[in-house]
């Protein structure tokens, strides 16, 4: 049976259909917002997966190019691997949902959101989060807490709910808020240096607007939701938990109180070895349960240290940032390099400048078709002292790269001001927490070292949270290290400048964040950010005055759009000759803006001169130095500008009578000529006689 339910959100219809499609899925819904439509299917395995200590949730965000009326480019005319944006959207769906499943639930769960229709005014990634929550709530899977997602824009001082395409262009803020009835589950934001109080108010606005969508989901569940299955939840057997606690708790507590990371890890390795030796014969089939019990006790000790003893694992104050180190200019041949160190976290970012032709072309369902500034993040195994095969970037690397990219995007100079494609690559050399925000700092250093005139330096910091089990006690931590991230409840990343916030990303492991935690995290991040920015400015106070000598040389010129065809020529003949003769790269925009770049400045100058000649208009009354291209009985043809020839009649060749043209000029001669007339057919009439006369008069006056 087909069930439908509908509501209005921000003046546009939101509708869910259940029971019509995907009959063999546990739940399959078609959810629409305006003309944007997402097909969402959710399924779970019948039995828990054995031998694991995590919840195996898989979220897939599938883009279909037919949703925007496109056929995939390239030789193979079908969708390939997910785009970076699809991967990021899949992560954004996963993050608010994962903490809301029952603790100990180990069944495989798969959520597949397929984008089947897109209207640019209504973003599919926002609808997909709502659709995933709706499908899970309607299914028999034990997920019972609806999650809603909205986007918040800011135009002037007004917050806009789910802004349209035009409003997004005008908005200085792109904020996604995911929430339950009680708390905020996830935040993603990019902004043009948004003040802290404005950001907090925007998050509150988004939280309030989520409530209408939560109500919509609850109504649908009450009307046609499936009965929930009773889950088989994994729990460490009480006998094992008590035995491990009695044997090892004091040793674990003593080890976790060691402030030095390496000494603490070595001590814990010894404790784990003793635990294994003690219990592997008695409980040979329960070693994973023993490992889980040890993890729970480590977490318990860390929470007690922070909430009851007021101590951090490394001895810092709750609002203290680790030691900062900044360095630029490390590599001799790169265009810009920044090395940023925060405690045991270290990132080296390298900036490369390229021609405008090297922009990244995007073949996806979004409105953005190309990208001039990009940031890539690499996290090799050696950064944590491990041995693993080197693979391509995973979801985490793509997500961290995009986060650092978003943090600096509002600060990158315009194409007109700085005609380069900019690529940043952050190499994580050592990781002990918050490498994505270290990448923001490293990127700032590299851009300044490369001579990129960014609006202002940016820095990033990760804030953490430790709570009691009943959430009545909360402590916000500044600059969390790996241990606090691993055992903590929140990763609240904030990047920005001294003027305001440029990006936020928030993940939580608990059932949401209170308003107080969000406020304290945002203002705590500002205090830390300003301190880090001071360190960056001490290292390099402003962008280099010139780009690296190894960077391409570029020049821009504006031509009449009607003249573009003259520069390109039939079949690209003219532009290809310029490129071949000068060794440059040429990019021409529709508005007539021309970018010329090359490794050598001489080639750029020569190409610019040729293009100016091709596009310059011949004017009557002007004198030109032209080249004789052809001789006829009645006169000489002279090229006054590239591809622009005129005729000097034999009677206009000299002050005296000329019998033969060859007596005065030969092919290849350069002569001064004056344009006497451009007739109605565009023919150019020239006079050498008039040019000589004017030159003689000027000499007399001098």
Swiss-Prot record:
Its EC number is 2.7.7.8. NCBIfam families: polynuc_phos, PRK11824.1. Involved in mRNA degradation. Catalyzes the phosphorolysis of single-stranded polyribonucleotides processively in the 3'- to 5'-direction. One of its GO terms (biological process) is mRNA catabolic process. This is Polyribonucleotide nucleotidyltransferase. Its main location: cytoplasm. InterPro entries: ExoRNase_PH_dom1, ExoRNase_PH_dom2, ExoRNase_PH_dom2_sf, KH_dom, KH_dom_type_1, KH_dom_type_1_sf, NA-bd_OB-fold, PNPase. It catalyses: RNA(n+1) + phosphate = RNA(n) + a ribonucleoside 5'-diphosphate. Its cofactor is Mg(2+). The keyword Mitochondrion does not apply. It is an enzyme of class 2 (transferase). It is found in: Cytoplasm. HAMAP family: PNPase (MF_01595). Mg(2+) binds at residues 485, 491. GO terms for molecular function: 3'-5'-RNA exonuclease activity; magnesium ion binding; polyribonucleotide nucleotidyltransferase activity; RNA binding. Gene3D superfamilies: GHMP Kinase, N-terminal domain (3.30.230.70), K Homology domain, type 1 (3.30.1370.10), Nucleic acid-binding proteins (2.40.50.140). It comes from the Bacteria. Residues 621-689 form the S1 motif domain. Residues 552-611 form the KH domain.
